[in-house]
Regions:
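Metallocofactor- and cofactor-centric catalytic cores in central/energy metabolism, strongly enriched
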Residues: 1-167, 171-203
Length: 203
């Protein structure tokens, strides 16, 4: 464990910091520009995987896959919470565009009404004529969405538009024994720039 005190920050380390990010509608800023495919029900997981693999093979562009192992049959508050989490993932500023996969048309219609601030397409598996047809429809949608985000460019953004998730422990044998001076020094810089942060302490 380290017993060396962290050096005080110089003003040059915290003055006028910026980064190159993707500005989204509503003012949020992303540091990534992911094309994502989101399966809202486990029945769609394999279709999401195969459609993503086909797009990656055709374009050499990565697709962020977001899937769950159990998503169907939840009721009331449980279903609302699950849908809220999925929606917040789609709205994350690091996602530039998203394809949402549902099982039935009714669910697809509900999801289609939710997103207006970024390119999002919703596809119901029941709209396809079997798995192969649905994979083809999903691949076509990914291509359209990919074309949308290829035109996005990074622009200078103030450091204060970032939100950081921090973990102070779990990285070495000294976790929960002593503090992490690197995290502490970073937080000092972040606070000086009015950055939001969420810390997960391990101990």
């Amino acid at each position: 464990m380290s017993t060396i005190a962290a050096k005080p920050l110089s003003s040059s380390m915290s003055d006028g910091l910026s980064f190159m990010g993707f500005v989204r509608q509503g003012g949020l800023v992303g540091v990534r520009n992911h094309l994502a495919i989101i399966s809202t029900v486990a029945l769609c997981n394999r279709i999401a995987e195969l459609a993503a693999q086909r797009h990656e093979a055709d374009t050499d562009e990565p697709v962020l896959q977001i899937k769950g192992e159990f998503q169907r049959g939840l009721q009331l508050a449980d279903a609302q919470l699950q849908n809220q989490v999925i929606r917040q993932l789609i709205e994350h500023p690091n996602i530039g565009a998203a394809l949402v996969l549902c099982h039935d048309r009714r669910s697809a219609q509900a999801w289609q009404k939710l997103f207006t601030n970024k390119p999002v397409e919703v596809l119901a598996v029941m709209d396809g004529e079997g798995v192969g047809s649905t994979i083809e429809l999903a691949s076509q949608a990914l291509e359209r969405l990919g074309q949308e985000i290829r035109g996005y460019v990074r622009v200078p953004c103030p450091f204060s538009t970032l939100t950081f998730a921090l973990e102070c422990g779990g990285s070495d044998a000294s976790s929960a024994v002593c503090s992490n001076p690197a995290v502490g020094q970073f937080v000092d810089v972040a606070i000086a720039q009015a950055v939001a942060g969420v810390d997960k302490g391990v101990g």
